[in-house]
From Swiss-Prot:
It comes from Aromatoleum aromaticum (strain DSM 19018 / LMG 30748 / EbN1) (Azoarcus sp. (strain EbN1)). GO terms for cellular component: cytosol. The keyword Transferase does not apply. Coiled coil: none annotated. The keyword NADP does not apply. Belongs to the AIR synthase family. GO terms for biological process: 'de novo' IMP biosynthetic process; adenine biosynthetic process. Keywords: ATP-binding, Cytoplasm, Ligase, Nucleotide-binding, Purine biosynthesis. It is an enzyme of class 6 (ligase). It is found in: Cytoplasm. CDD domains: PurM. Pathway: Purine metabolism; IMP biosynthesis via de novo pathway; 5-amino-1-(5-phospho-D-ribosyl)imidazole from N(2)-formyl-N(1)-(5-phospho-D-ribosyl)glycinamide: step 2/2. This is Phosphoribosylformylglycinamidine cyclo-ligase. Its main location: cytoplasm.
Length: 348
């Protein structure tokens, strides 16, 4: 007589439902801290409900999605998981801010091969912190435990932000003209871009990541989370309506490829390299990797995380407002007419 077949469970297949439930319990108080009055219900429903405020006359929804890229590989290597969540939020909310949108809510996707509740909770704590700093609600997400899809200890992240802007106040760069001033808001570090090159440089240079680097361990400088520009920029736009003619979030492609995205074909941005100092991290990356200057400006933010274009007449007031909000602001250059075939953004 044959022996009875064993009774299999989802856990036998590599999926721990109890761990998922435990994570949800850890997430709920984190998400609660981010709630806005417009949120209807809490975490755990099939869908998240958000009531659009009546303060908008002609609201236009603005959405964005992004990830953290290979910065995650360094987080795995250094066993540091509490900062990449803020990166995830910043990459999307800074993007939708560019069009003048106020971020309203955020959802995340966390995928792994084997769910480690402590690791996932650390990631979500960073997501919640990013939502708090940008004033948007963490209203939902998905945790996908997929045995065999990812190596143990590794995971991937995606984030989704939705915001709103008055139709008449959409910022699309159409009001930019020659003579306008290009301002730059300081970045906190490499943010979430260029990490494939950063990892290559680390592999070749083999620095001591625990060594002091200008007062902090190098590992902390490299993993410094992306700066959130939402509250200072929304404050500026509220204080001086119409002051912002265009914005560019300096992400993949650096200054050279992101600023042109908001310029008409006949315009160019001329940025003065002497208007700001290359931060120590980027100096080290340049020297350790022997990276060409133009490649630096095409890969990294080089210390400028957000570009803001304003009229020359309002530049002083804009700088004063942003500095009062805690931002470091550089006068990077000006907008000029562009000759046919000329580059739309130069740094020199």
């Amino acid at each position: 007589m044959s022996s009875p077949k064993p009774s299999l469970s989802y856990r036998d297949a590599g999926v721990d439902i109890d761990a998922g439930d435990a994570l949800v319990d850890r997430i709920k108080p984190l998400a609660k801290r981010t709630m806005r009055p417009e949120v209807l219900g809490g975490i755990g429903g099939f869908g998240a409900l958000f009531e659009l405020s009546k303060k908008y006359r002609e609201p236009v929804l603005v959405s964005g999605t992004d990830g953290v890229g290979t910065k995650l590989k360094l987080a795995f290597q250094l066993n540091r998981h509490d900062t990449v969540g803020q990166d995830l939020v910043a990459m999307s909310v800074n993007d939708i801010l560019v069009q003048g949108a106020e971020p309203l809510f955020f959802l995340d996707y966390f995928a792994c091969g084997k769910l480690d509740v402590d690791t996932a909770a650390a990631v979500v704590s960073g997501i919640a912190r990013g939502c708090e700093l940008s004033g948007c609600a963490l209203i939902g997400g998905e945790t996908a435990e997929m045995h065999g899809m990812y190596p143990d200890g590794e995971y991937d992240l995606a984030g989704f932000a939705v915001g709103a802007v008055e139709k008449s106040e959409i910022i699309d760069g159409s009001r930019i003209v020659p003579g306008d001033v290009v301002l730059g808001l300081a970045s906190s570090g490499a943010h979430s871009n260029g990490y494939s090159l950063i990892r290559k440089i680390i592999d070749l240079a083999k620095p001591d990541l625990d060594a002091d680097f200008h007062g902090r361990p190098l590992r902390d400088v490299i993993l410094e989370p992306t700066r959130l520009y939402v509250k200072p920029m929304l404050g500026l736009m509220q204080a001086i309506p119409g002051v912002v003619k265009g914005m560019a979030h300096i992400t993949g492609g650096g200054l050279l490829e992101n600023v042109p995205r908001i310029l008409a074909d006949g315009l160019a941005a001329r940025l003065d390299v002497s208007s700001w100092t290359l931060p120590p991290l980027f100096q080290w990356l340049r020297d350790a990797g022997n990276v060409d200057a133009q490649e630096m400006y095409r890969v990294f933010n080089c210390g400028v995380g957000m570009v803001v274009i304003v009229s020359a007449a309002q530049a002083g007031a804009a700088v004063q407002n942003l500095e009062a909000a805690g931002e470091i602001v550089y006068r990077l250059g000006r907008i000029e007419s562009r000759a046919e075939g000329a580059a739309q953004t130069t740094v020199g």
